[in-house]
Regions:
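Acidic/His-leaning functional-site neighborhoods
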Residues: 188-235, 245
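Short strand-coil-strand connectors
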Residues: 65-67, 91, 114-116, 192-196, ...
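Surface-exposed beta-loop interaction hotspot
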Residues: 116-185, 192
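Intrinsically disordered, low-complexity terminal tails and inter-domain linkers enriched
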Residues: 3-28
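Protease-labile, long low-complexity intrinsically disordered regions enriched in Pro/Ser/Thr
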Residues: 87-132, 136
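Extended, aromatic/histidine-rich regions of cofactor-dependent oxidoreductases associated
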Residues: 239, 245-283
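Extracellular/luminal recognition modules and glycoprotein regions
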Residues: 36, 41-58, 62, 67-68
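Forkhead-associated
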Residues: 56-104
Length: 283
């Protein structure tokens, strides 16, 4: 790693104008969140370490260049065939023969298939299988310096209301890899900014929290082309905190091989959201 992540994040506070609430608990909580984000992104198997997403439909013979083993799709699994010279392990044990694999769900570092420090992670999207390769020695991880983020400003911590749809819906949206896929949506978040009501369509996560993909007037200019927002679970009356100070860069801001969805229709705000994470900064 080319720099100390926590020091970089502290340096980003230089020059704040006093409107950020730096003496209060909200700012301190945000600063801690920001520092933890930098550390997580820069982790050995964090998003910076992704060096490839290989769709098995592109390799009918199951042989992926520079990835050991043979990967063949079955009905509900992928069958990996390996020889001792491939250097593959499955569940920590050397692979010599076949192993049936399903999609990995846990942390990248605990994925079932490895080759030394590299992790080979199975991904399933709309019936298509892919192998993702995470390498702690990736050029992106080596070059990473910090995440550029706007210091906390209470103006961007808003009260919102979640309005669930009667029935969950799926819309087709372009993804960062150029393909179009379905994006599940469970409702919309309504909030008021400078006297104007705005809404964002959002997905509902298994734990009840929300997830929205949005763009705004800063996107592609002073910030990345789109960002994520992850509010907590609404209360029983639908009230939810909409804190743009914690707007996140999507994984594809850190590695080109992620397949992040673009914002769905209606999720491009006319306002300039000068808050949250803006861009990745490299050395």
């Amino acid at each position: 790693m080319s720099t100390d992540a926590q020091q970089d994040s502290r340096d980003s506070r230089d020059g704040r104008d006093g409107r950020d609430g730096s003496g209060n608990q909200d700012f301190q909580d945000w600063q801690r969140w920001h520092e933890e984000r930098i550390v997580a992104v820069a982790a050995p198997h964090g998003p910076l370490s992704l060096t490839g997403t290989h769709w098995l439909s592109d390799y009918p013979d199951g042989r992926i260049p520079a990835v050991p083993g043979q990967w063949r799709t079955g009905r509900d699994e992928v069958v990996l065939t390996g020889a001792p010279e491939d250097g593959l392990t499955v569940d920590g044990k050397p692979l010599a023969g076949e192993a049936g694999l399903t999609a990995d769900r846990g942390p990248i570092g605990s994925s079932r298939v490895a080759r030394g420090e590299r992790r080979l992670v199975l991904l399933s999207r709309e019936g298509q299988w892919a192998v993702r390769e995470f390498d702690p020695h990736s050029p992106a991880r080596h070059d990473f310096r910090t995440i550029d983020a706007t210091p906390y400003d209470a103006r961007w911590s808003l009260e919102g209301t979640f309005r669930p749809y009667d029935t969950a819906r799926t819309v087709r949206v372009a993804n960062a890899d150029g393909r179009e896929r379905g994006l599940g949506l469970g409702g919309e978040i309504a909030f008021t900014l400078d006297g104007t009501e705005h809404t964002l369509q959002a997905a509902v996560e298994p734990d009840g929290s929300l997830w929205a993909v949005f763009a705004d007037a800063t996107s592609g200019n002073s910030s990345y082309r789109f960002r994520f927002l992850r509010p907590g679970a609404p209360d029983e009356d639908g009230r939810v905190k909409v804190d743009f100070n914690r707007a996140l860069l999507p994984p594809c801001a850190f590695a080109d091989h992620f397949i992040c969805p673009f914002p769905p229709p209606g999720n491009t705000l006319t306002a300039a959201v000068a808050a949250g994470e803006r861009n990745r900064i490299d050395a």
